[in-house]
Amino acid sequence: MENTWKVIMTHSDAEPWWFFEDWKRDIVKEWEFDNKSEAVRKYLDECVALSREFPNMKTKKYNSIAFWNENEVVFCEACDDDLQMYHGIILFENDHLIENVDTLEGLKEEIQSLANEKL
């Protein structure tokens, strides 16, 4: 069986590393690749684009990254409060989460460097 790689973009009131039961509803874009290098390049390109659009970025596990603007919120009637909206990016191999492409801090630094470089 050949490996397939996916880059998935989400938009949700939960950061992309929280895989709640209905998390797939939050997928807004998905790209599939036959090789790792193309998938990682797309992942980095999308991270750079998101980092230019949204001033806040946080990495956690599974090479998931959340981007957000503090003004993008939705009101939750059930909790009677505003919820922050997040734009997430995640990398998968054979429909499994990838734990490490690089170290998370190294990845975050690379994204910031690429974002500044292409301006």
Go through each PLM region and give its residues.
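Short linear motifs at secondary-structure transitions and domain/linker junctions
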Residues: 3-9, 39, 60-68
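Ordered hydrophobic segments in well-structured contexts
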Residues: 4-9, 30-32, 84-92
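Structured domain cores in non-transmembrane regions
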Residues: 14-21, 36, 49-55
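A short, exposed loop/beta-hairpin motif centered on an aromatic-Gly-Thr core
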Residues: 24-41
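Amphipathic alpha-helical interface segments used for dimerization/assembly
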Residues: 43-47
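Short, mixed-charge low-complexity intrinsically disordered segments
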Residues: 48-119
